Amino acid sequence: MNIDKFTAHAKSVIASSQLLAAKNDHQQILPLHLLSSLLSEETGIIQTLINNTGGNINLLKDQVQLELNKIPKVQVEGGGQVYSSAEALKVLEKASSIAKDNGDSFVTIERIFEALTYDNTIAGKILTNNGINNKKIATAILQFRKGKKADTESAENSYDALKKYGRDVTELAESGKLDPIIGRDEEIRRTVQVLSRRMKNNPVLIGEPGVGKTAIIEGLAQRIFSKDVPESLINCRIIELDMGALIAGAKYRGEFEERLKAVLSEIKESSGEIILFIDELHLLVGTGKTDGAMDASNLLKPMLARGELHCIGATTLDEYRKYIEKDAALARRFQPVYVSEPTVEDTISILRGIKEKYELHHAVRISDSAIVAAATLSNRYITDRYLPDKAIDLIDEACSRMKIELSSKPEELDELDRRIIQIKIELAALKKENDEHSKKKIEHLTTALEKLESQSYDMGAKWQAEKSKLQQTQKLKEELDRSRNELERAERDANLAKASELKYGIIPEIMKKLQEAESMDNKGLLKEIVSESDIASIISRITGIPIDTMLSSERERLLVMEQKLRESVIGQDKAIKGVSDAVRRSRAGIQDINRPLGSFLFLGPTGVGKTELTKALAGFLFDDRNAILRIDMSEYMEKHAISRLIGAPPGYIGYDQGGVLTEAVRRRPYQVILFDEVEKAHPDIFNIMLQILDEGRLTDSQGITVDFKNTIIVLTSNLGAEILVNQKEDEDTYKVKDEVMEYVKAVFKPEFLNRLDEIILFHRLNRNNIHDIVKIQLESLKKILLAQNIILEFDESALNYLAEKGYDPSFGARPLKRLIQREIQNNLAKMILAGEISSGKTVKINSKDKELKVTMS
């Protein structure tokens, strides 16, 4: 007997029988040990053979274990060596003989099992007593192998390969596990046309990720199941190839190719009744490729060309170009079927079609307004993904969120229960006190507790009743779904009696009960309908763009936005109004959706509040003054520095890192972007800003389109500042606008200026403005000191002194900050370090004899 002529699985069975004998302290390997190992093998081949011969594997296992327990145990010091008995060797010799007689090059596990039926020991008797004999097993092996010979060391892997390495999509359609497919008739028709060709009948579905390529295959499977296809495809089955399972565990060279060949030969033998579906078709190119080995695509090519293999592929445009088109021999064997992204209207139809499946899964109801919102809002705000995938994700997540809310305690009831616990803790503490005040407090809290417990009990009972009603509705929906599947099956099997009973009796009755349950007033604690606002809320969480329903407090806040901004920015009312109007337009949803929310060029001398207004705007929108993307344009004075904004071109360092501007906006699409000191940048930088301002988009160095439609763009500049500085104090700034614009037009091209929403002039600050700014600066200092528990007080004389001394029409408010540092903060720092000012003290600032006094009280 040559052990090398046994397959890897057969060797594994012999080795495990040896381990079993050693574990049980048996002196030698008996046929019983071989039978026990065969009954426990992992491939499932032996179990299938036993089932096909009418045996029961669990009964066999129990009987074998009983007999193993009867074998005498002999313990040898040091473990000893376990040898094969003459009977076991005879079984293996018989297996080799049977394999040879049947034309097998290798001995497989089923041949060892067949040899055991010839055994005269207890193992053979157990099989005979269970009705398993050599004739039955030989017939079962013949049927199971379907004429295949064991000619490789891993022959067992090639049995029933399609079942191991594939998924029957037609079977899923039959059992009703696939979502209904709406539309896509043209793509399905084109796929059927290609499949019906004589040669090269292999379509490949090409489209962006998430447009529904796999759904088209599921739609075709449903049509095959319902016989809504040409005669040539009526008896076909679609099997999806699992490339992961095919590759997994292929340790030895040639094992992967052997598995794939087994799959292909099964398809070939089916005489065109099996259509192979390969999702992510590009994985074929290079899969299994090692030194001197062929990759999967080369194994497929001959069969594809001859029309022996019906194959449908699916891949994305990028991957098709990158992998398939490079292999011209493979590309010509496939016929491309392009799958475009559906329109918003088509997406709404698709969502309406699959709505019932999601309602059933999540046990909630989806309103039609939620479906329309999911399609329209995802199309507008989620720009880096494709319909219908992104819209379906929104519906799914909104339903999931509502399902979690339904299964948890309502907020009102939760608050009541927390209040009850709080009162009980207070009562427990007060009962330890004996004073009159505590007794009164106990009496008061006891009354409140009784009232709250009564409310909690009533609300809890109401919640449980509502929950029970929802569960009842869910059961009815599940029953209706089951009945519809049964009706389809009955109609297909021509079981007219059952079909009529379901169609005219059971289904109408369930629908009536369901309508009654859903029509009952449900204005209680639980909300079970997914609405438009739920979808908007999910998008807001994903993108950070506030499109969910505005609270009344936010509406009021937006109407008084100018007042809020004036608290930080003094004396620039026209600029504040222009920015406020842009924000209100965007939050009201009436701005041009293809442009940024607002684009402004702020012109004015230094220190008048251009950058400060941008920070105040960020503070108003995001409650964080630093939530702005600030790009200092003085860093982009050289032409080559421009590429930093959108990313370095291919071949340059940093190509894979993305651009400063594009990456920041991709990660946070709703923000204020400040291009500071814009006139200092290289003129070419404005060319890339043209499409941002006009179309609200920009393509980075890697070809990714970044959406700027939810940004506010602010550009600041000092152009024409000398004109504004030399202007009379009370003169209207807009009288000199034409002169300032001459400077602006000399630097910026007309096509750039024409794309801005507004060019806003900041006038120079007058003495009254400086007085107000002093107050803001001192209030800011007051907050800083308050954090150290030091109180700061100042009077009007201090304000007047600082305003007079810090006023400089050429430099705006910036000298004022330096003055406060010099006159106040420096003195305070010395006093704190010297220990003169400590926590809890009050510091007073006033002016006397044209000097600023800092005193402590």
UniProtKB/Swiss-Prot annotation:
Keyword Mitochondrion: no
Domain Clp R: 3-147
Spans traversing the lipid bilayer: none
Region annotation Repeat 2: where it falls in the sequence: 84-147
Gene Ontology molecular function: any one: ATP hydrolysis activity
Binding, ATP 2: G604, P605, T606, G607, V608, G609, K610, T611
Sequence segments annotated as region (C-terminal): 765-857
Family: Belongs to the ClpA/ClpB family.
Identification of the protein by name: Chaperone protein ClpB
Source species of the chain: Rickettsia conorii (strain ATCC VR-613 / Malish 7)
